[in-house]
Amino acid sequence: MRDRLIAANHREYGESYEQLLFPTPSQAQRALAHRAELLDDLHGRVAVGYGGTKLDCTGLSPGCRICAEGGWSCLFITGRCNCRCFYCPTAQTENDPPTTNAVDFRTPADYVGYLERFGFRGASISGGEPLMNPKRSLAYVRAVKKHFGDAMHVWLYTNGTLADDDLLRQLADAGLDEIRFDIGATDYHLDKLRLAAGVIPTLTVEIPAIPEDLPRLKGMLGKLRDAGVMHLNLHQMRLTPHNFEHLSARGYTFLHGEKVTVLESELAALEVLQHSLDNNIGLPVNYCSFVFKNRYQAQAVRRRNVQFMVKPFEDITDNGYIRTLTLLGETATVTRQIENFKALSIDDDLWSKGNSPGKLLVHPQLLKLVNNSAFR
């Protein structure tokens, strides 16, 4: 597995891969020791969930709870952004139509229908920068909230540069439940964020954990709380072909995994969480690791979509994959097994003849009724 991940990462970046700094054995050992020390200190003080990929789960924002439970849809309202953050994973220069999961939604009504069809409980408006197209963003927020009311939690991501009193009040009137500011895009200025306090019900800051900004971020946790921020979400920084030059020039130590991530980013996030608890700041901090995003968010998509594809004789795994149990045997053996199912009045939707006479597809719950020695 390790070699396969390294090979995949190497292929993604080609010749540029050689520019990346990966930890030496001694560096890796020190980093693991520091990480273990932080986690040991946090043990018993935080709730760790989702296979150890997310903490602290005790004070998650309403939107984060829905995301973690797999009930969230993210609508990219536009592909354009007016900021050029060094950590951004994509170019953010295209004026794309509203899109999610590679499906375009040309009208708010289309998106409402999608949310209803798949049973979502939360929807976010993202980009790009959604406030570059306020009319479109307002239309989609308004349509979703009008249709679902309190049954749908709606939030919006923004760098805040285009926010003003009037626009924030319009978003509140449209029913927006939560707004998330990326203050890393504005050098951690809080003036626009303060405008949203008391206007939008839930005020959240969501930023990458930038290692060199660790002292600054620790020092402003109290200011965030006093400004009305209710939740701080910290993401692990991830390398992409778009941000490769920016991240590789900063001397970060990179880690192999399902994608290449920044070692120091995770350590910084854990230190911020530790600092917040040690000093009783009262601002819930959520570390959203790349593994959580890549594994559990993808799992949620699979489990939601698979409901429309799974056949009655198939099973769904915890990870959202379709599992088919195939019995192979002589034609006469398959025939006898089918006759046994019929004699027991087993629903014939729970089994199916295969595409060859010696094959039988059965739901796992029927396995106890099968003479396993007769099949292979």
Language-model regions: role of each:
Residues T93-F105, F118-N133, H147-A163, L171-H189, ...:
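Core AdoMet radical
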